[in-house]
Amino acid sequence: MEQKEFDIKNILLKIEKDKNETSKKIQEKYKDCTIEDLEKSLRIQNKKSEEITFISKKIEELNEKLIVEKYKPLLSSSNNSNEIENEISPKIKEILIKNSILKNENSAVSPSITTTDASASLSFGGKTIVLPSNQPTTLRKSDAPADTKHIKLEITNDNKINIIWQDAKNYQSKDWVALYNYKYAPPDGYVNNTWYWAGNKTSGKVETGVTYDANRTQQVRYYNYQNELISQYTVESQCWIDIHGDLGSGLQVNWPNYSTSGSNDIIAIHNSNFGEPKDLANSIEQCYANKNDGDWVSEIINCGLPYYAVYWSNIGGGNYIKQACSKPMTPVDRKLAIGEYYNGEDSYNTSVAAFYDSRANDDKDYIMVTLKEVDQPGTPGYNAKAANGIVLSSNHSSYNDTLYFWGTYCSFDNETGKFYIRQKSCALEYRKWITDNYSKLKDRKVRNLVLPGSHDSATYFINSLSPKSPDADHYKYPDYLLTPWSKTQTCSVYKQLCFGVRYFDLRVARLKDKLYIIHNFYSDSVKQVLKDILQYVSENVNEVIILHWSHLYLVDEDNKLLMKMIIEILGKFMSNSNKGPDVKVGDLAGTPIICIYDDLVNPLSNGGAGGNGKRPDIRDPRLWDPSCISSPYETSRYHSFESILKFLKSRINVPKRKVLHVCQAILTIEFSYEFFGHDLITWTVEHRNKFNEFFNDLETFASPTNIIMTDFVTFYPLSSYCIRRNTLEFNNSN
């Protein structure tokens, strides 16, 4: 998380640095220019808005400098300074006051005035829009004597623009007025030659014939015979624009007043990861603003990127200004996760798997799988669209000895023309995910957490040479057919814990003088599994771990031996069963292991199914009764993906007892199925995406979920899924 924040900070610093460098370049470019040079430069096409703004401001500053240089000696040395002051135009007087050449006689008066004239209501199309009662003009008090050149914009019922100004008969014949459709236009940037003489030979009103476009800012200005801006009146744009669309569907853009939009105005869709778009040229699709009735369904498919819609106004000369910009669409989390795949006949032939949301990936998106973290997009790796939700690295022996490998999702930013890192994930993120989110989870009941679980958790050592165990006596098939369906995990219990798995299904039988984990065949020793758990819990004392011992093929002496081994190795980390199924995460601090000991399903013990149903008299209180967990499943019925999914869906809305609950997303083998030439790994890979869709539906509809148990648990993005659900549910509850 700290790395992501560091990346964002660096990006913001880079943007600010680029902005400062651009500003310096513009200043250097125009530092020695005259007013004439600058005005000429304004007429050159394809200038960016920041450059236009700088030039306009520079012209204004140079004009002010000339005025100050002209009048300062006259007013400071002349005996006729009062006469000179009276002859100075209001605009020049304002500049001299600003530069402390003249005193401001109206300094106690508010610097702006507000029109209360009836023209503050705009009438067009038979409708009236009342502007705010305090609609300001840009007139200054010092510019507003009794005969002020107060200019206004009027919109007629047929949606045409008139310009009105006061007391024309008192003004110079060479004064003039003009109409502009954006605020920062140079003096000669008026609309379609709509400038008019405004002096003593006019009526103070002109009908421009220009259609009012509510999507543009409209401005009228009054200039004196020296081309000095005296007053102006602005009607702000009423333009807005919106972009939306479901993931995988065409993006839809809406905007108002399309019928009066300029025929050369453009609606554009942008993909920008670094703030509002700045240039029409970087858009990914366009349409004309006066088309599509203001409702445009683009051919661009929503791939979950930060899309913007922008209304670009044509200001002539091939130049455009941004009239309105939508809020960005929130980028869709690709649900990037890291897993580990087993390939081949031994568990040391391993690939790193990068899982991600397979819906609507952009053609340019790609995934990198690396043994170290990357800070910049590298050589494009696996195409995200083609890979359809999962990429597997090439086999790499280094993956067996480390969790420090990364998946990196890269997308393209059209605004900058570069790839950027959209999301990163590392297997180490799951190592202590409960501890990392402890403040959010400590008050949650364990039965209300969503937890990854592994089915027949310690079967990673099963191979074609493994001896058959007592639970396989009813199968009368060769070992080479049965072993591929008996191995359900490829990672050790310690590595599963590091991958974020928190529920373990453990079955036990004796072989010679040792107790082993079994599933049709003998796998790793119980002692080694307990040592794996001890190693992990010693490093992570707040990570909730649920051990479910069941299907115990043990005589009474072995049953007691197993309980003794568990207590001796893990005892100090085991919580007391009197805490019950309502136990909260915080209640397990320091003793995070819930050890459920189900010795009823035991055909060899007097206390099990083969005996009198009575348990041993002595039972440690740290061994939880199996009544604290529910794990519904019918092994005789679910032998295909369709039947399993139907069962799982049927259980979603069944009221659940207030105990731990297991969702068994697993297959039970039945030889009526065509198993020859198949194995459980192949079946899991074939149906993995369908199970993921089911899990995603549980998330979408916030269906109550506790433990999700699967075969080959690292083949699924379950840990990141559970982290997301637990933290999101916490955020929603707050």
Swiss-Prot record:
Residues 440-604 form the PI-PLC X-box domain. Residues 8-70 form a coiled coil. GO terms for molecular function: phosphoric diester hydrolase activity. Transmembrane segments: none annotated. It holds the Pfam family PI-PLC-X. SUPFAM superfamilies: PLC-like phosphodiesterases. Keywords: Coiled coil. InterPro entries: PI-PLC_domain, PLC-like_Pdiesterase_TIM-brl, PLCXD1/2/3, PLipase_C_PInositol-sp_X_dom. One of its GO terms (biological process) is lipid metabolic process. The keyword Metal-binding does not apply. The keyword Metal-binding does not apply. This is PI-PLC X-box domain-containing protein DDB_G0293730.
